[in-house]
Amino acid sequence: MLGPKLAEAGHELTDVERAEKPSFDGQDVAIDFTRPDAVRPNVERCLDAGIPCIVGTSGLGPDDLAALDAKAKDKGVACFVAPNFALGAALMMRFAGEAAKHLPKAEIVELHHEAKLDAPSGTAKATAELLPGDVPIHSVRLPGLLAHQEVIFGGLGQTLTIRHDTISREAFVPGVLLALQHLPTLPPGVTVGLESLLE
């Protein structure tokens, strides 16, 4: 799904992992949407080769991000990491941060397909970091779902729900294209969050 959309936008996608003789020769950027257990070694290999990276795989913790940041700075390349590449999800996070200034009591409910490996999701954890206090996160894994998140705020006599629903993985393509557009202008090191690229 990502390959054809990148090709439509004028980019060429090469699957280095599946190549007969894996090589980074001629590669401008590495994009990782793999698994939590593979993402850090994948990105470290790319950074060691001086290849800037875009990472959309959940599962990188603070220690992982710190190690990747140090390596990217050492190699003088940018590494962009986002818990979610859907523009609507980035806006949901931004709006939730704004709402929390006025309604500080909140809980997060995130719902994903049953094959999702992490719970809570990276998006839910990143959203919780934007809100004051220790925000409870409720995770649901069921067939029939793709990716959904709502932030429910409660105040005196009222509630506010900010919700984002991903109904197709195509929702991630504009965010990846935005990251590709901004990657050459990012400083060496790790930059986190699609919202940092939204004007």
Feature-to-residue mapping (PLM):
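Short beta-strand and adjoining strand-loop segment in the mid-core
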Residues: 85, 96, 113-117
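Short acidic/histidine-rich motifs immediately flanking catalytic phosphotransfer sites
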Residues: 23-31, 47-53
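C-terminal substrate-binding/catalytic lobe of Rossmann-fold NAD(P)-dependent oxidoreductases
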Residues: 1-24, 37, 101-199
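Glycine/charged-rich beta-loop-alpha catalytic/anionic-binding loops adjacent to active sites
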Residues: 27, 51-52, 73-81, 155-162
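Conserved NAD(P)H cofactor-binding loop of Rossmann-fold oxidoreductase domains
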Residues: 34
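Rossmann-fold NAD(P)-binding glycine/threonine-rich loop
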Residues: 37, 41-44, 48-49, 57-81, ...
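Glycine- and other small-residue-rich loops at beta-strand/loop junctions that grip anionic moieties
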Residues: 31, 57-58, 84, 116, ...
